[in-house]
């Protein structure tokens, strides 16, 4: 069945809560192993039902934020989902206290019960109303940014549509596009400040109710981080400052020379090449057809996966009016299919969706029937390793998408990935400050972000733009609003993906087998153990970053300079 044909009927929330509660009562009283496992399966099936319906609503709301029906349904889910979170917490408590715990761990591994313990630390009935308020504020941010209507040269653009123009070869066009974009954010700064301030205060309130001084450790536990914490993140950021920031500055200097602008302003940065950034050849239909060819050639598994995505209509790719910004992959657990959402806008980012989000989706497809499904509840640094690594495994096929621009794509892909890491670290360090200082004013937050930004991104010249000079850039980063402390995961995953890129150049079969193994391990092992199991070095370890950088710079140096202008 195709996605558009999936029938949505509002669930009987009260009935499902009652049904699961009754099953949980039975689980806690299980007399033997068989009864315990049988009831556990029934409980899982009930949770999957509500997850499936929620994801259908969420996807359809993302596709059209102006659809009042799905907007209303999503608000209903936001109100009721904390009740199901409480039931999931109860399931975890029962597992931890059950006399069949060792049987469960023997059959399904210990990681689920380790996460149950994290959940014990982060849940209390007293925070339910606060979680509802948090969800409503997150939805308010999505609605505000998703509904942005920005005038540019007589036309109305959304955020994604305007970002595409910021890569234009004409400098005045880039400047005007950025001024329009930042003008919208500046005009909405007070609303964005209020939403974020309310979120920080609610999250701090939640942390205090749970017995924590700040929200930071709560966020780490909620992210399922079993074997690394904020002290690991701090040491990791120090490695970025020492090794990656200097390399990124050299890449920016090379860019300035290449595009002939000695003192680049912020609106020059998206233009990597004077001849124009690499653009994919073709519209959505052609790009998807090329992606199918690519995945069939890459492996039997990837070919089967992508064909199913097309046949079942599990992608909504091109930007349009009312569509939420960004891109993501999510899963429909009963349909047993992943779904890819994005905003194609005619840039190389369109191809990145067909590799990055497809990497997420491929892993979801490989593990679509995993039981218990909690063994597929990925930590984000592992999830993003799946997606970012797929970007590199598909490198040999980029000529299909870019033709003569493929050499530029290869360069820009690696260079942009290196340049991204300091930005990701800046967002993480900013959040450390925000949640350590929840009473800071919006003005103080912006000043702190600008201070951090100068440390990790010293090349930035905002050309006197008041909104940016005062530290407003972070408000465009939705993760700060929606998923506290998530963003550093992208950088950790990037280091893992770089390792796969280097390994793939040396031995494709070894690299691909390791990647498939990592996908199938899913969430059955904590991060450091999973990486060790598949032969990757931990990004937190001293020397991991330093070791791979020479191979990346060597690769960049090997590309044809005549084609990179």
Which residue stretches match the model-derived regions?
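Long, K/E/R/D-enriched contiguous segments that form extended
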Residues: 261-290, 363, 414-420, 425
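Hydrophobic alpha-helical scaffolding
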Residues: 127, 131, 185, 189-193, ...
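C-terminal, non-catalytic "cap/extension" segments appended to globular domains
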Residues: 113, 117, 318, 354, ...
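Glycine- and acidic
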Residues: 122-123, 180-188, 228-234, 269-280, ...
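A well-structured
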Residues: 1-277, 564
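Active-site-adjacent "gating/activation" loops or surface patches in catalytic cores
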Residues: 157-174, 280-355, 359-364, 466
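Catalytic Zn2+-binding segment of zinc metalloproteases
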Residues: 359-373, 393
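Post-HExxH zinc-binding segment in Zn-dependent metallohydrolases
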Residues: 242-243, 367, 378-407, 413-415, ...
């Amino acid at each position: 069945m195709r996605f558009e044909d999936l029938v949505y009927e509002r669930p009987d929330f009260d009935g499902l809560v009652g049904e699961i509660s009754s099953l949980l009562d039975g689980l806690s009283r299980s007399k033997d192993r068989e009864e315990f496992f049988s009831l556990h399966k029934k409980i899982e099936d009930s949770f999957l039902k509500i997850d499936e319906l929620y994801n259908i609503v969420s996807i359809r709301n993302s596709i059209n934020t102006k659809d009042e029906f799905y907007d209303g349904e999503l608000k209903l889910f936001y109100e009721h989902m904390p009740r199901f979170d409480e039931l999931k917490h109860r399931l975890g408590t029962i597992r931890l206290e059950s006399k069949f715990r060792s049987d469960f761990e023997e059959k399904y591994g210990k990681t689920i019960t380790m996460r149950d313990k994290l959940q014990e630390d982060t849940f209390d009935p007293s925070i339910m109303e606060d979680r509802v308020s948090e969800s409503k504020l997150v939805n308010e941010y999505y609605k505000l940014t998703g509904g942005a209507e920005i005038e540019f040269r007589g036309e109305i653009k959304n955020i994604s549509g305007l970002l595409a123009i910021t890569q234009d070869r004409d400098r005045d066009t880039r400047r005007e596009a950025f001024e329009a974009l930042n003008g919208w954010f500046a005009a909405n700064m007070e609303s964005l400040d209020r939403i974020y301030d309310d979120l920080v205060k609610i999250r701090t309130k939640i942390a205090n109710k749970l017995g924590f001084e700040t929200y930071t450790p709560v966020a780490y536990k909620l992210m399922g981080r079993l074997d690394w914490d904020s002290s690991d993140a701090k040491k990791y950021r120090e490695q970025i400052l020492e090794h990656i920031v200097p390399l990124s500055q050299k890449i920016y200097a090379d860019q300035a020379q290449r595009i002939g602008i000695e003192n680049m302003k912020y609106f020059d940065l998206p233009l990597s090449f004077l001849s124009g950034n690499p653009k994919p050849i073709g519209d959505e239909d052609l790009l998807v057809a090329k992606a199918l060819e690519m995945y069939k050639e890459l492996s039997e598994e990837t070919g089967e996966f992508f064909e199913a995505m097309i046949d079942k209509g599990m992608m909504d790719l091109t930007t349009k009016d009312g569509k939420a910004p960004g891109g993501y992959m999510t899963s429909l657990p009963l349909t047993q299919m992943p779904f890819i959402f994005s905003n194609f806008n005619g840039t190389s980012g369109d191809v990145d969706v067909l590799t990055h989000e497809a990497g997420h989706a491929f892993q979801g497809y490989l593990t679509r029937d995993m039981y218990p499904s909690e063994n597929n509840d990925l930590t984000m640094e592992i999830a993003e390793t799946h997606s970012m690594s797929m970007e590199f495994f598909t490198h040999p096929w980029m000529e299909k998408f870019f033709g003569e621009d493929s050499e530029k794509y290869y360069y820009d892909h690696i260079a942009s990935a290196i340049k991204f890491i300091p930005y990701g670290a800046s967002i993480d360090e900013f959040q450390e400050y925000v949640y350590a200082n929840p009473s800071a004013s919006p003005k103080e937050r912006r000043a702190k972000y600008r201070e951090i930004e100068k440390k990790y991104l010293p090349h930035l010249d905002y050309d006197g733009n008041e909104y940016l000079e005062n530290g407003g850039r972070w408000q465009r980063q939705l993760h700060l609003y929606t998923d506290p402390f998530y963003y550093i995961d992208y950088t950790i995953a990037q280091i893992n993906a770089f390792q796969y890129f280097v390994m793939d150049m040396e031995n494709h079969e070894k690299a691909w087998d390791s990647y498939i193994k990592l996908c199938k391990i899913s969430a059955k092992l904590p991060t450091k153990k999973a990486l060790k199991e598949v032969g990757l070095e931990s990004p937190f370890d001293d020397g991991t970053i330093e070791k791979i950088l020479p191979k990346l710079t060597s690769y960049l140096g090997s590309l044809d300079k005549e084609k990179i202008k």
